[in-house]
């Protein structure tokens, strides 16, 4: 029988035995960020007397049903959301097991540690402690404003969701020995916005010494553009506050001045969370910023100087992260329309060279792999590659790259279509059947990596899916245990450090080494007619490199 009572800093917790492992759900790692604590750094959780039951998930963070396909373990959303969940196989405090902390994806505006695909029981049965932790999202987690900045010693604001993640890691480091864990063997992990968070945590001075390894899947905060300055974030916060007050004024009949958004903090703090969420109604990636506290400079500058947390890193993404339709924005799939969609990011003068580099030469290329490669790089692939590459150059620690390639099987249910967050939404009446993906779409890797395929009943999982999951999840577990994904019976996975042609592990039914590439790594500067051929040839050489040479 596993030990179900544990003494944490704040008091005694009573968990639940799951046939050899113990799960503790809804464990508070910080005070509820409500009332006057709205838009403040997380504060310590309160102590309690007696035994606190930890058998049910705490509330999800406040969020709108943006994706419509997330499978939560609780139906309750609340501003009081700073809870974590622990799955431990330890029988005593003295086992010193390695620890995984998973931060959910969802664009920093949706998602929760209660989602079934992140559940840690399968990983715990492989000999590690697995943890999920919530953090504030959307306007509750990433709202900057001049009035908020005046309240802080560092004269900045925003980034509260990232600070929640720091608080969760600190709580785990301070308490995990009581659950049989090793505070010096913590690995932080995330997918999509969770992966962006891991890269941000590595760049923050608040995290030095808090974790031993890091893993990221499909995302980083080091993309094509710099993150916002504090002034830019504050200005956007004022504009959002003005929008909220105007929307409320329409309902109440109250007249709102043109500068009301500049001095409205008391009113916004007093607003019920549900009302604030609806009035803000922002369905875009929140604005995080160089606030002078969580971020003291641009993350790219931190990594360029070698000032990031220097730990082993396992990083990668999927081979079909995004469809070209995201670049086309509703227009027909032609080269000219795809160029028009890409110009906003790359500029008119660069677009022809860029398309030659990708091999997008005719309309048929637009929806095929060349167009998919461009759309995926624009979405998250390039940012993910840049994170791993910069850490390779200045981190002084091993970096392991992967590319997840295995497509999900056919759906087990009818009348649905797959959505971005991993689940399904209702198919539109009369819509043409959606063809099965040729590769791994965004978020498709999560259940395979976390060995949680049975929790997702949308897809008709086949033996080959479980085989891929066994391989991928074992790489994950090995990395958490040792900082190296390699292990007995697995294909060799070399680090990319010191390699002219960096190796990437292609995770599939046939898992093997290949060449690590993204065409955009050769597109750091405008492509002249004289240089694009050389760049294109180099990109193709990396694509076609013989794995035996890696």
Question: Which functions belong to the PLM regions below?
Answer:
Residues 184-225:
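Primarily recognizes the serine-hydrolase "nucleophile elbow" in alpha/beta-hydrolase
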Residues 105, 164, 192-195:
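Active-site loop->helix "elbow" adjoining a glycine-rich segment at hydrolase catalytic centers
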Residues 385, 389-550:
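Mobile gating loops/cap/lid regions near enzyme active sites that modulate substrate access
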Residues 69-74, 154-159, 222-228, 299-300, ...:
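Active-site rim elements
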Residues 81, 154-177, 232-235, 239:
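Alpha/beta-hydrolase active-site loop
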Residues 95-99, 126-131, 182-186, 207-213, ...:
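Loop/turn elements at helix/coil->beta-strand transitions in domains of secreted/extracellular proteins
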Residues 70, 174, 200, 208, ...:
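Substrate-access "cap/lid" subdomains that shape
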Residues 1-159, 183, 459-472, 482-490, ...:
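Non-catalytic accessory segments of hydrolases
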């Amino acid at each position: 029988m596993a030990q179900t009572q544990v003494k944490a800093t704040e008091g005694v917790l009573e968990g639940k035995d799951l046939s050899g492992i113990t799960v503790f759900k809804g464990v508070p790692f910080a005070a509820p960020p409500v009332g006057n604590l709205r838009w403040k750094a997380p504060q310590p959780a309160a102590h309690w007397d007696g035994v606190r039951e930890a058998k049910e998930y705490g509330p999800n963070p406040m969020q709108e049903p943006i994706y419509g396909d997330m499978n939560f373990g609780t139906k309750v959303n609340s501003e009081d959301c700073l809870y974590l969940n622990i799955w431990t196989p330890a029988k005593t405090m003295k086992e010193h097991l390695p620890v995984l902390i998973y931060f959910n994806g969802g664009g920093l505006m949706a998602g929760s540690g209660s989602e079934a695909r992140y559940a840690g029981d399968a990983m715990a049965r492989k000999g590690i402690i697995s943890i999920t932790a919530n953090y504030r999202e959307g306007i509750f987690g990433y709202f900057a404003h001049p009035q908020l900045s005046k309240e802080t010693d560092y004269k900045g604001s925003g980034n509260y969701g990232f600070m929640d993640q720091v608080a969760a890691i600190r709580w785990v480091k301070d308490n995990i020995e009581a659950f049989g864990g090793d505070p010096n063997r913590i690995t932080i992990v995330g997918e999509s916005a969770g992966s962006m968070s891991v890269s941000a945590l590595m760049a923050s001075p608040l995290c030095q010494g808090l974790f031993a390894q890091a893993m990221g899947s499909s995302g980083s905060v080091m993309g094509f553009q710099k993150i916002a300055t504090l002034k830019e974030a504050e200005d956007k916060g004022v504009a959002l506050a003005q929008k909220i007050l105007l929307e409320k004024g329409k309902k109440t009949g109250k007249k709102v001045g043109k500068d009301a958004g500049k001095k409205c903090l008391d009113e916004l703090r007093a607003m019920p969370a549900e009302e604030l969420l609806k009035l803000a109604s922002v369905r875009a990636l929140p604005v995080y910023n160089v606030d002078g506290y969580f971020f003291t400079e641009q993350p790219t500058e931190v990594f360029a100087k070698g000032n990031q947390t220097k730990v082993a890193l396992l990083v990668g993404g999927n081979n079909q992260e995004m469809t070209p339709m995201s670049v086309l924005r509703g227009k027909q799939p032609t080269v000219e329309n795809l160029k028009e969609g890409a110009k906003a990011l790359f500029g008119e003068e660069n677009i022809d060279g860029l398309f030659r580099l990708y091999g997008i030469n005719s309309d048929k290329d637009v929806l095929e792999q060349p167009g998919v490669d461009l759309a995926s790089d624009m979405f998250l692939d390039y940012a993910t590659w840049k994170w791993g590459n910069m850490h390779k150059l200045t981190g002084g620690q091993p970096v392991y790259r992967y590319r997840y390639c295995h497509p999900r099987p056919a759906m087990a249910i009818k009348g649905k279509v797959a959505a971005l967050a991993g689940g399904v939404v209702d198919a539109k009446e009369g819509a043409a059947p959606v063809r099965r993906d040729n590769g791994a779409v965004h978020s498709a890797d999560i259940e395979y990596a976390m060995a949680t395929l049975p929790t997702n009943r949308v897809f008709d999982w086949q033996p080959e899916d479980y085989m891929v999951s066994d391989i991928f999840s074992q790489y994950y577990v090995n990395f958490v245990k040792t900082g190296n994904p390699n292990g007995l019976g697995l294909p060799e996975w070399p680090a990319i450090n010191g390699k002219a042609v960096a190796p990437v592990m292609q995770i599939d039914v046939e898992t093997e080494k290949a060449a690590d590439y993204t065409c955009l790594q050769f597109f750091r500067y405008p492509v002249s007619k004289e240089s694009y051929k050389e760049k294109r040839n180099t990109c193709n050489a990396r694509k076609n490199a013989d794995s035996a040479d890696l």
